[in-house]
């Protein structure tokens, strides 16, 4: 497509993770295993929480929603990456690239807001244990979950609205395995310094502030636990520790990628793999391995299926 003297690109080319065919095959097998594990682990959480009446509490309904987010988030990048690892030419259309950016930031933004809801849930459970069920009623937690999805949608629309007007007239080589703002922005045929600043403010600083507030919230919760009896304190502390691990796994890579100037660094791809592929797989493992109620529910589900 031509406008004046500019030839607009119709697609982008990924450099991917490796140019060596043998290594690409190995990476395909490894990440196929990771993606299958991600899908099965998160589906297991969704089915377990849905089918086990003992888990029909706000905390586990929130955990189920997190599993849905993890499943969808990994599916934005992993299937395309797997196909490209077996392909000679790794391309994505302009429309596909913008779509990937939209869903990546939609689900990533929803994840950020959703982790705040989970922190709020734990705060109510520990500070007001006798009123927990009353405060965290169905209307409230459903409203909070809907708000997280709406928040992610608004965040993504802002990202996309800033990207769509940009002209892309070449080159079209992306040194990555998926479309994301930092890499695509560098290919625009115009000065993007102001836009880069707006992107860092919209994503990076939001991540930093949100991460700090969440850590302070969990620190406050852990301090409050000192007044609880032994067994209740141990169980609540284990749950909070799990949440802190998950929050750190999600926010630290995101801060690295978006809270700095969009200059490429050698670690970028490795951090992106952890952020987009590994974390969605590890989240269900962390929650099931550290949560005795989830472990018991999974065993009950297994026995029920065998009967």
From Swiss-Prot:
CC terms in the record's Gene Ontology section: plasma membrane
Keyword Coiled coil: no
Family stated for the protein in its record: Belongs to the G-protein coupled receptor 1 family.
Membrane-spanning parts: 26-49, 58-79, 101-120, 140-158, 196-219, 236-258, 270-289
SUPFAM superfamilies: Family A G protein-coupled receptor-like
Membrane protein topology class: Multi-pass membrane protein
Keywords per UniProt: Cell membrane, Disulfide bond, G-protein coupled receptor, Glycoprotein, Membrane, Olfaction, Receptor, Sensory transduction, Transducer, Transmembrane, Transmembrane helix
Disulfide bonds: 97-189
Glycosylation sites: 5
Membrane side Extracellular: residue ranges: 1-25, 80-100, 159-195, 259-269
Compartments, as annotated in UniProt: Cell membrane
GO molecular function: G protein-coupled receptor activity; olfactory receptor activity
Name this polypeptide is given: Olfactory receptor 4D2
Cytoplasmic face residues: 50-57, 121-139, 220-235, 290-307
Function: Odorant receptor.
Superkingdom assignment: Eukaryota
Protein encoded by which gene: OR4D2
Predominant location: membrane
Biological source species: Homo sapiens (Human)
């Amino acid at each position: 497509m031509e406008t004046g003297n500019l030839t607009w690109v119709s697609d982008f080319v990924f450099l991917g993770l490796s140019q060596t065919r043998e290594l690409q095959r190995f990476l395909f097998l490894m990440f196929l295993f990771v993606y299958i594990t991600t899908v099965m682990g998160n589906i297991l959480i969704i089915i377990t929480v849905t089918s086990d009446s003992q888990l029909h509490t706000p905390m586990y309904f929130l955990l189920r929603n997190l599993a849905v987010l993890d499943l969808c988030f990994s599916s934005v990048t992993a299937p395309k990456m797997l196909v490209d690892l077996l392909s000679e030419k790794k391309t994505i259309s302009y429309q596909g690239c913008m779509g990937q950016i939209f869903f990546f930031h939609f689900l990533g933004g929803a994840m950020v807001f959703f982790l705040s809801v989970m922190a709020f849930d734990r705060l109510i459970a520990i500070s007001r244990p006798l009123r927990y069920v009353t405060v965290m009623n169905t209307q409230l937690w459903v409203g909070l979950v809907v708000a997280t999805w709406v928040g992610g949608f608004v965040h993504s629309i802002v990202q996309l609205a800033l990207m769509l007007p940009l002209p892309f007239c070449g080159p079209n080589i992306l040194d990555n395995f998926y479309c994301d703002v930092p890499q695509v922005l560098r290919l625009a045929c115009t000065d993007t310094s102001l836009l880069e600043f707006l992107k860092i403010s919209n994503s990076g600083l939001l991540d930093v502030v949100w991460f700090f507030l969440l850590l302070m919230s969990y620190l406050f919760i852990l301090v409050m636990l000192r007044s609880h009896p032994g067994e209740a304190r141990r169980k609540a502390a284990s749950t909070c520790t799990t949440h802190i691990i998950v929050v750190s796994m999600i926010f630290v890579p995101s801060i690295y990628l978006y809270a700095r100037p969009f200059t490429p660094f050698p670690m970028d791809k490795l951090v992106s793999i952890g952020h987009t592929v590994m974390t969605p797989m590890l989240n269900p493992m962390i929650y099931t391995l550290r949560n005795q109620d989830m472990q018991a529910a999974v065993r009950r589900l297994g026995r029920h299926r065998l009967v």
